[in-house]
A protein has these predicted regions:
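Acidic, glycine-rich two-metal-ion catalytic cores of nucleic acid-processing enzymes
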Residues: 185-282
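N-terminal leader/targeting and assembly helices and adjacent pre-domain segments
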Residues: 1-186, 273-294
Length: 294
């Protein structure tokens, strides 16, 4: 069967599904870093809460200062943990960008009926995709800062609520970290652990699609159009379902990810006239005719 744009699409979609394994692995590593630091964090926070309880709680300025001091403490003790998380995410996404530039090119050229070398985006372009390309209107630095800030905000909300309802430090700690017999899944911190998957999947999808977009732009002589391909299942959003199969000029139109946990991808439509006709034989000519279209 001669190669065609359908073959390129199928291979890129299959690779996009495999990429979700990468995001799950990255999320596991993020959670492992957080979990490793949690016992010490839990003990030190409990000691601080014991001190606040011993001094008494009231809605006045003294308690307000203690709460501000507590939030600074939480940030200080959390900073090394999230610094390690951030470094892990950054380094793995940079490695992903470099790998996907080569993989994307190999997938496309592997389906062409002639020997053809694609132009690979420069290293600085790949790094810019990781660090400067917006993902859901935020760059990577903002995603990572928000991940830590939201974790801290949720903990402070639980502490304030616990103090207002006169809960013990043990009860407040349980609110945050959950019960050990349930693996902490009933605590507010579990939201942070689950959020690792959202962050990993959305950022890795952004890097993957950004690299493909750069690859198409670097080879616009043969990539004239792109097709939006959604992963169609029960989790597909209405917007991605409506865009599935839509064809756009190269570099124009909506670029995935267009929402949190987006799994869509844009695949190229190769113009056979830009590829050429070497080596010339009947099989190649037939395949090129399929690439050119009617």
């Amino acid at each position: 069967v001669p190669p065609s744009n359908d073959d390129i699409r199928d291979e890129l979609v299959r690779h996009n599904v495999e990429l979700q394994r990468f995001s799950r692995g990255l999320a596991r590593r993020m959670r492992a870093i957080i979990n490793r630091a949690e016992p010490r964090f839990r003990a030190e926070l409990k000691a601080r809460l014991d001190n606040i309880a011993a001094l008494g709680f009231d809605p006045g300025p003294v308690t307000t200062r203690r709460m501000r001091s507590l939030e600074r403490f939480i940030k200080a003790i959390n900073d090394p943990t999230f610094a390690e998380v951030n470094q892990t995410v950054r380094s793995e996404l940079v490695a992903l960008a470099k790998l996907e530039a080569q993989t994307g090119a190999a997938i496309i050229t592997g389906q062409l009926p002639v020997v053809f070398a694609l132009t690979i985006p420069e290293q600085r372009t790949l790094r810019s995709i990781v660090f400067a390309r917006p993902m859901e209107r935020r760059i990577l630095r903002d995603w990572l800062a928000g991940y830590e800030a939201n974790d801290r905000r949720r903990m402070m909300d639980e502490i304030r609520q616990g103090l207002i309802f006169n809960e013990t430090p043990t009860q407040i700690s349980r609110r945050i970290f959950g019960r050990s017999e349930l693996g902490g899944t009933d605590g507010t911190r579990e939201i942070t652990r689950r959020g690792a998957q959202t962050l990993a999947q959305t950022t890795s999808a952004a890097v993957f699609n950004g690299v493909l977009a750069a690859l198409y732009a670097a080879n616009k002589r043969i990539v004239k159009k792109e097709v939006y391909v959604a992963t169609l299942d029960s989790r597909t959003t209405a917007i991605c379902r409506s865009l599935d199969g839509e064809v756009f000029p190269q570099g124009e139109g909506p670029m995935p990810p267009i929402h949190i946990n987006c799994r869509s991808v844009r695949v190229p439509t190769i113009d056979g006239r830009g590829v050429g006709t070497r080596p010339a034989n009947a099989t190649t000519e037939k395949a090129l005719a399929g690439l050119r279209g009617p």
